[in-house]
């Protein structure tokens, strides 16, 4: 079901949809900058969050760059909600996934600012335990929302390519998320690598969703289901 908007408003939303691409670029930039400042950082073993831990040499610059990611990422979540409510409605299942994504990202932005890792040794302190708890909730949200997005879009049978991508994203994200826990406990020397597959799959999904809105704003209208 289409909600009437002016062409200018639709164009503005399509342009703002690119905030998902910008957010992902900021995210990767904070990783690159952090590694430059921390030459001994081991990306195969260490998680990305080590780069912004309070005790990390890279904390200052990496955290400042991450503010750019936070801003554009939250903007992207807002655009997703508006676009698929006022411009194009898919169905309730798909939209529920978008709402859960927004909730997860707000929790991530606020939670990680309040409780960054205290150190890179992952000691059992209150601050670190809160960081782990927030991570657990966010990962659970993303497991559920990835399934909601994939199932919701697949139900329409209108966008097979995008449906396949979301199904693949769900598989990669859920599998790599579970493997991260297992590898961290049994093969910690590869924990950082597996975690990156998980996090970078999320960044790729944001870029694809962003470009999908940007290029498909005029031809992805569907009946509300």
Name each model feature, range by range.
Residues 1-13:
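Short, Lys/Arg-rich, polar N-terminal cytosolic tail immediately upstream
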Residues 13-21, 87-103, 160-169:
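Interfacial segments of alpha-helical transmembrane regions
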Residues 24-43:
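Alpha-helical transmembrane segments of multi-pass membrane proteins
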Residues 67-98, 144-156, 216:
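Internal transmembrane alpha-helix with an interfacial aromatic "cap," most often the third helix
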Residues 107-151:
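Membrane-proximal helix-loop-helix units in multi-pass membrane proteins
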Residues 149-225:
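Terminal transmembrane helical module of multi-pass membrane proteins
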């Amino acid at each position: 079901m289409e909600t009437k908007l002016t062409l200018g408003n639709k164009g503005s939303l399509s342009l703002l949809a690119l905030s998902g691409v910008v957010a992902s670029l900021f995210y990767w930039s904070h990783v690159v900058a952090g590694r430059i400042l921390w030459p001994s950082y081991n990306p195969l073993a260490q998680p990305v969050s080590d780069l912004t831990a309070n005790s990390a040499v890279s904390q200052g610059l990496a955290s400042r760059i991450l503010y750019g990611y936070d801003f554009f990422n939250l903007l992207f979540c807002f655009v997703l909600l508006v676009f698929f409510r006022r411009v194009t409605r898919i169905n309730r299942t798909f939209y529920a996934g978008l709402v859960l994504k927004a909730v997860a990202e707000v929790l991530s932005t606020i939670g990680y600012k309040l409780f960054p890792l205290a150190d890179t040794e992952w000691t059992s302190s209150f601050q670190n335990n809160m960081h782990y708890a927030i991570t657990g909730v966010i990962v659970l949200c993303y497991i559920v929302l990835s399934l909601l997005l994939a199932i919701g879009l697949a139900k329409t049978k209108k966008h097979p390519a995008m449906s396949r991508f979301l199904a693949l994203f769900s598989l990669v994200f859920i599998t790599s998320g579970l493997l991260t826990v297992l590898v961290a406990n049994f093969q910690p020397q590869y924990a950082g690598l597996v975690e990156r597959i998980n996090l970078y799959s999320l960044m790729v999904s944001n870029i694809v969703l962003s470009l999908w809105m940007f290029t498909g704003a005029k031809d992805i209208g569907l009946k509300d289901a």
